[in-house]
Amino acid sequence: MKNKKISARFFILFLLVLFNTATSFGQRAGMITRGKGLRHILISNGPQGPIHGGESAVTDMILMNDGLVYGSTKATWGAQNCHLFRTDGEKVEHILNLTSQIAGQTSISDLCLGKGNVIIGCTSTYDEILDDAGKGYEGGHLFSFDPSTGKSEDLGIIARGQGINCIAIDSMRGKLYGVTYPAGHLFSYDFKSGSTNDFGEIMKPWRVKDLGRVSWRGVPKVLMIDDAGTVYYSTYYHKEISLAKQELMKGGSSTYSAFSGGLIYRLAYGDEHPVFTGVTVPTQKGMDSDPLYENGIASAIRARDGGFWCGTINDGFLFKFHPSTSTVINKGKAFQYWNLKSLAYGGDGKLYMLGGRDEDNSWILCYDPMTGSIDCLGWPENAAQCSVICADREGRILIAENLRHSFIWVYEPSE
């Protein structure tokens, strides 16, 4: 009887080992099969710093005139510092702990190239802090950093208690435009005078609490500026509709909220009020009004043949937006998931895209403007959660993570 019990235990142990092995083989293995190679470099420096664990989630990257790619980070998992770094695709160099100079800022949310090869950035903080007025968050700052001198300058707070979600610069006219978070106000900043202008609420965001975490949906994630100085963005139209008399319930609401999403608006230079362009972001029918999804523009880049390439949040579509004619041309999608969160041109002339849900595998896709083909290349590594891509001076695609200990993958396209 004792031997039978021992045999049964060994059999159960064998089944557990077999099950775990099958599960491991059943998991998706990360791989990008095309191109010359894929390697990665670590952003965080470990316990010794200066970029500690929890401070290396990458928020943006831009290629500067000195040939280096500069990136920004945000704090995660309760960490408090955000940083600027730069890389040549071989190693990462820390250049600035921004929180040590502007206290209370835990995220550099966006970067732009300013006049004179100066970096312009904006800041924000944790959603939990923005959700609690008692935390006393002073507000998101604009700042500048000069790579040639290593000097940074605080350009001030835009809105008390509000972070800054995204910015874009009109270099010809010396203007910066941005969107506050979570209030969703469009604003401008004049570099010469230092004055700001609040154009008011362009999106009434809805507060979402998922698994105990608070966030706000619908706030524009990207701004586009054309040569005429006109600013474009996507937003929702929200209105309250009265219930019919027979629909009213005792003690219940007399109205319901209706949303119309993915509307592309423009603010012409010198105007005070944005207007609807008449076109909307491509979406699956019926999803434009669903509050569970964000139907908007996740990413945008100037197209080399005119207009802007844009990636959508809700469906992961790639589309071309022509501001001069208010035309949208949908190119479709090449993967199952959604959220084309970042775009970059590679050295081979193709448009590369980063897609995927915020807390899931990140996929690399490419669009060939010569053939019109969209292909899914795979993902850097199983469970790699990436936030942004950027081409370096060699035309390689840098793919950056937004985790506690983040890596940058360096992908070299085929010629």
Predicted regions and their residues:
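Short glycine/acidic-enriched loop and turn motifs that connect beta-strands
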Residues: 75-79, 125-130, 183-185, 238-241, ...
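Residue-level detector of Asp-centered blade-edge/turn motifs that repeat once per structural unit
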Residues: 63-66, 113-116, 169-173, 225-228, ...
